[in-house]
């Protein structure tokens, strides 16, 4: 799997992910970019799960963003509906963490679109470790969103065997 973490703080929203791709118990690649900018660089998205499945979902999500003029929530809901109801899409195994200047969301193949508490997202096999680290840093430090994401990914990479220390991090200015 992987670790993707997103933090929103002090006018910034940041999503970061590690770069490890595994096949069974073998590391196949260590520098996969699991976090991308979409829709004219106004949306950032990260994936946990099968790489091919995730890239398919990125393409579909970008189309939904275009269709709905970049409205993140509407595009996310439409993707989740299609993902849940389409027979072929239902087989895709991935989770998406997406964010724009206004909202941070998790999109699942079960049709869920969740805006998490405190705009903190952590998904993938290292998600629980990254979430615990990010939450502690949010509650007990004045660190910025990027620093929290970097430190959380580092901690997850030290603990989770499916997460490495190659990080891709994207950030946007945030209204929330």
From Swiss-Prot:
Domain of life: Bacteria
Catalytic activity: ATP-dependent cleavage of peptide bonds with broad specificity
Keywords, comma-separated and alphabetical: Allosteric enzyme, Cytoplasm, Hydrolase, Metal-binding, Protease, Sodium, Threonine protease
GO cellular component, one term: proteasome core complex
Activity regulation text: Allosterically activated by HslU binding.
Active site location: 2
Biological role: Protease subunit of a proteasome-like degradation complex believed to be a general protein degrading machinery.
Protein name: ATP-dependent protease subunit HslV
Organism: Pectobacterium carotovorum subsp. carotovorum (strain PC1)
Record gene name: hslV
